[in-house]
């Protein structure tokens, strides 16, 4: 479990407030690796407006598999890398327990990997 603790000012957990997912149909590169996903959000969470023609009762289903926050990594073809947390809440969990937590460790490891060859 990553980020299952209080965050600074945005409620609980590293996934919330605004979320995003990996989706090949929407431009996620084929080489992207989904490291983890947060699911089970309340019905207050909906698809991005560009994915909906209209909002109706059917569009408010809570069990929609596309309403999730994906933690994604991919290497770019030019030698770089992308680490996407899939949620604006991620940053608010970095300082929890004096930075001794899963969010800080994973962020540190991702940044260290990106800087390794530079």
Question: Model-found features: residue ranges?
Answer:
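Extracellular ligand-binding/catalytic regions of CAZymes and related secreted enzymes
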Residues: 1-118
């Amino acid at each position: 479990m990553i980020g299952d603790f209080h965050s600074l000012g945005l409620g609980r957990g590293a996934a919330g407030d605004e979320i995003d997912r990996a989706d090949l149909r929407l431009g996620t590169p084929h080489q992207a690796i989904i490291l983890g996903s947060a699911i089970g959000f309340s019905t207050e969470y909906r698809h991005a407006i560009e994915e909906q023609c209209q909002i109706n009762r059917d569009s408010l289903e809570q069990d929609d598999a596309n309403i999730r926050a994906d933690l994604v990594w991919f290497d770019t073809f030019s030698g770089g890398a992308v680490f996407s947390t899939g949620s604006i809440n991620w940053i608010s969990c970095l300082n929890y327990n004096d930075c001794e937590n899963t969010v800080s460790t994973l962020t540190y490891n991702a940044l260290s990997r990106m800087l390794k060859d530079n």
